[in-house]
Amino acid sequence: MSIEFKNVDYIYAPGTPFQTQGLTNISFKIRSGSFVAIAGHTGSGKSTLMQHFDGLLLPSKGSVTIADKSITSNTSSKSLKEIRKKVGLVFQFPESQLFEETVLKDVMFGPLNFGFSEQKAKEQAIQWIRKVGLSEQVMNKSPFELSGGQMRRVAIAGVMAYEPDILCLDEPAAGLDPEGQKQMFDIFKNYQREGHTVILISHNMDDISQYADDMLVLEHGHLIKHASPKEVFSDPDWLKKHFLDEPATSKFARKLEKGGFQFSEMPLTVDSLVNEITTKLKSKGGNE
């Protein structure tokens, strides 16, 4: 399911002394079934942008089109329910979207809200509680008794349980150990492979280079680049200018290049780095 922004502005507290420009003239299109990363330093407008995907925020100017439904400044709350069934948001702080008495009830809430039967909602909830790596022992606990990492998993399960066409994630791996982070990102990547669109906000360029196939870069509420991660990360000077880190893999590869190692193309993932080095060494060995 595709998303298109056309000349979107967003203004916080318009007409008051606290008026602030959140987004300025944002235009882009996200392909259906893609894995898109949104990057930018703190305060660049990433979370503001994401909240436009399901109408939590309405554009002050311009339009957002999702599944042939247009969202503008005049869109009513009633007309947003169909869009919100198709777009799931996982916020940066999971406690902000947990509220039920038990984990099971919390994860069931989304499916029930969007028309699932009680039995189907329970089946979906149990399935996704397991998928995100939680044991059934937590199902009858209050979500607020859990650790931060467990709460994040519950929040993710609660959105994925109604299987939205578009999944939006704001720093979803924060608070998880490396194994937990990989487990979550493998779930998100598999969800994309099943035909869904996944949108990720992250400060972690390694995650972006590993999983995303498209990338939006924001700065002070402006979209300054829309390209593949390969293109964005190909220019370390541009990254430095805009206060973005380079993925650890390509940073290491550039050090190897300074030592005389030549890459056919700059690797962005550990697998591509290892494959490139292995191929070069085998080729060199065969020529000796």
UniProtKB/Swiss-Prot annotation:
Instruction: Give binding positions for ATP.
Output: 40-47
Provide the GO MF annotations for this entry: ATP binding; ATP hydrolysis activity; ATPase-coupled transmembrane transporter activity
UniProt-listed Enzyme Commission number(s)? 7.-.-.-
Give the matching Pfam families. Answer: ABC_tran
Q: Which UniProt keywords apply?
A: ATP-binding, Cell membrane, Membrane, Nucleotide-binding, Translocase, Transport
Membrane topology term reads: Peripheral membrane protein
Q: Where is the signal peptide?
A: none
GO cellular component terms, A-Z: ATP-binding cassette (ABC) transporter complex
Which residue intervals define the domain ABC transporter in the entry?
A: 3-245
Q: Which InterPro entries match?
A: AAA+_ATPase (IPR003593), ABC_transporter-like_ATP-bd (IPR003439), ABC_transporter-like_CS (IPR017871), ABC_transpr_CbiO/EcfA_su (IPR015856), ECF_ABC_transporter_ATP-bd (IPR050095), EcfA2 (IPR030946), P-loop_NTPase (IPR027417)
Task: Give compartment(s).
Answer: Cell membrane
Q: Which family does it belong to?
A: Belongs to the ABC transporter superfamily. Energy-coupling factor EcfA family.
PANTHER family according to UniProt: ENERGY-COUPLING FACTOR TRANSPORTER ATP-BINDING PROTEIN ECFA2 (PTHR43553:SF27), HEAVY METAL TRANSPORTER (PTHR43553)
What job does this protein perform?
Answer: ATP-binding (A) component of a common energy-coupling factor (ECF) ABC-transporter complex. Unlike classic ABC transporters this ECF transporter provides the energy necessary to transport a number of different substrates.
The subunit field of the Swiss-Prot or TrEMBL record says: Forms a stable energy-coupling factor (ECF) transporter complex composed of 2 membrane-embedded substrate-binding proteins (S component), 2 ATP-binding proteins (A component) and 2 transmembrane proteins (T component).
What name goes with this protein? Answer: Energy-coupling factor transporter ATP-binding protein EcfA2
* Naturally occurring in which organism (per UniProt): Lactobacillus gasseri (strain ATCC 33323 / DSM 20243 / BCRC 14619 / CIP 102991 / JCM 1131 / KCTC 3163 / NCIMB 11718 / NCTC 13722 / AM63)
